[in-house]
Amino acid sequence: MYVIVDIQGQQMKVEQGRRLFVHHIKDVESGASVEFDKVLLVDNNGAITVGSPLVEGAKVVCEVLTPLVKGDKVLIFHKKRRKGYRKLNGHRQQFTEILVKEVVA
């Protein structure tokens, strides 16, 4: 059984027992329980239920494993030819690691 759930603007395929890295969730601690109720699709062993836009009564219960994980550094380099203009910026995205405990459909 799997569901497609909207977590902070991103659609993810979720199954019970799976670990996910989602965009940073503010004000949560390690071991806290988080629920996501924006379920868009439910596949229960071949029986597919598509919401319009959401499936009523379905939710995903997760446990926070690591509240703050930093992703790899992405470098952004700007240059204008023949002018000596060079600029380098970097960015590290913050994530939260969660474990899917239960899928209620």
Curated annotation (Swiss-Prot):
It comes from the Bacteria. Keywords: Ribonucleoprotein, Ribosomal protein, RNA-binding, rRNA-binding. One of its GO terms (molecular function) is rRNA binding. GO terms for biological process: translation. InterPro entries: bL21-like, bL21-like_sf, Ribosomal_bL21. It holds the Pfam family Ribosomal_L21p. The keyword Ribonucleoprotein applies. One of its GO terms (cellular component) is ribosome. Part of the 50S ribosomal subunit. Contacts protein L20. This protein binds to 23S rRNA in the presence of protein L20. HAMAP family: Ribosomal_bL21 (MF_01363). Belongs to the bacterial ribosomal protein bL21 family. This is Large ribosomal subunit protein bL21. The gene is rplU.
